Amino acid sequence: DVCSSDLGQPRWCPGCGDHFFLNSLHKALAEIGVKPWETAVISGIGCSSRLPYYMNTYAMQTIHGRAAAISTGCKVTNPNLSVWQVSGDGDGLAIGGNHFIHAIRRNIDINILLLNNRIYGLTKGQYSPTSPRGFVSKSSPYGTVEDPFHPAELCFGARGRFFARCVATDGPGTGEVLKAAANHKGAAVCEILQHCVIFNDGTYDSVYNKDGRAKNAIYLEHGKPMLFGENKEFGLMQEGFGLKVVKLGERSEEHT
């Protein structure tokens, strides 16, 4: 069993998104049927990087930013291992950004789990590479002057073949993403949106609860229309180089 009561209680703040994600990962791996002795969970440094301590598998917490490099080595050394890399947005995209893009470019068969809360939590609240422009933090008291990384763009820019995004509080959706990543042969990047309840609470309020997701999130399913809203009454339409929201059934003079 990948989950064991002997592993102790996670040392995360109450309400941290890491709790939700850990439960989803335990459940997904159990449903996939992976064997603990054929699974390795590798992390860097950060709050989310404590996750390997709560896995009844081969597990290793490495040095800051090097989880992708160690994960690559594990997979190349033993191709039969199911390798799961866990990194936060700071660990994975700042000090570990170089390893992140090259693991994707090489298309190594590892699962890269990027837990994105748009903040450095372990070091007490500095802005990260995914913090939005103008974000006020301990290291940017007047607001950041930088534009953030979008992990999906980085992944596709590095010629990635698999990218998925989910919300930590959406257990079923997260589970489906993790199982799809496990079944993909090659580098699979999963971005998990979550709150840091101490230093960046509310950053994903628009999709963090069930009602918010019904209004603002699109569940992409192969062969099905991209609809959202409480009654699936909204869709997306291309407009120039971007997208715009349209309400189904309303006549658009531009497209008649």
What are these regions (language model features)?
Residues D6-I63:
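Active-site diphosphate/adenylate-binding microenvironment
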Residues S128-N183:
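Conserved thiamine diphosphate
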Residues I45-G121, G175:
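Thiamine diphosphate
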Residues L7-G8, I198-E254:
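Flexible, low-complexity linker and terminal segments
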Residues R161-Y219:
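ATP/pyrophosphate-binding catalytic subdomain of soluble kinases
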Residues Y58-A59, A103, S128-P132, A181, ...:
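Short, hinge-like loop/turn segments at secondary-structure boundaries
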Residues G8, K35-T39, T77-V83, R105-N111, ...:
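Short coil/turn connectors at secondary-structure junctions
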Residues V2-S4:
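Short, small-residue-biased leader/transition segments that mark boundaries at the very start
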